[in-house]
Amino acid sequence: MSWLFGDKTPTDDANAAVGGQDTTKPKELSLKQSLGFEPNINNIISGPGGMHVDTARLHPLAGLDKGVEYLDLEEEQLSSLEGSQGLIPSRGWTDDLCYGTGAVYLLGLGIGGFSGMMQGLQNIPPNSPGKLQLNTVLNHITKRGPFLGNNAGILALSYNIINSTIDALRGKHDTAGSIGAGALTGALFKSSKGLKPMGYSSAMVAAACAVWCSVKKRLLEK
């Protein structure tokens, strides 16, 4: 009945032990050479309780025996332009464009919304129901907030583009370049209103840039 249940016969055991040679080791060696890694899990896990794993015997494509590798990607390097170090680490003009425009837009949106709320509270009709009072305040908030936020975002977007262009042409970033970019941005923003509004806008944006540069310089020196 050994042929039915697959039991080994004495003839099989005798053939396996002919000449006192173990035929399993050559088979494992040839299999390891063909696969390129250790196929026997018993040779990988060793030590008391089988808790130690020899990573050098695992698949070579996994690279587990090389330790920790740190990637140094060029796109992750910070900007090396002279004077370009700011309050937030920046990789170039694209980061300045995104961060600067987004921050100024949110700031303008918040200030405009707060201003609209104050105006709405002052203009609430007397003896009006609660829904009308709430609607009045919300109307002023949605009117002033997006208006100031959009204008501030346009100014910041134009300023960052002009400032980055000036820095690229001069090869450095400094206060003079920022003030010049602010003056050009203000003049461009009111270019359709005439020379006098252009002058006022140019002076105001240039003054704001000068104040920002002085504040940033003080913060970086601390």
From Swiss-Prot:
Residues 1-25 are annotated as: Disordered. Keywords: Membrane, Mitochondrion, Mitochondrion inner membrane, Protein transport, Translocation, Transmembrane, Transmembrane helix, Transport. GO terms for biological process: intracellular protein transport; protein import into mitochondrial matrix; protein insertion into mitochondrial inner membrane. Disulfide bonds: none annotated. It comes from the Eukaryota. Residues 167-174, 216-222 are mitochondrial intermembrane. The chain crosses the membrane at residues 97-118, 145-166, 175-189, 197-215. It is a multi-pass membrane protein. Component of the TIM23 complex, at least composed of TIM23, TIM17, TIM50 and TIM21. The complex interacts with the TIM44 component of the PAM complex. Present with 1440 molecules/cell in log phase SD medium. Essential component of the TIM23 complex, a complex that mediates the translocation of transit peptide-containing proteins across the mitochondrial inner membrane. This is Mitochondrial import inner membrane translocase subunit TIM23. It comes from Saccharomyces cerevisiae (strain ATCC 204508 / S288c) (Baker's yeast).
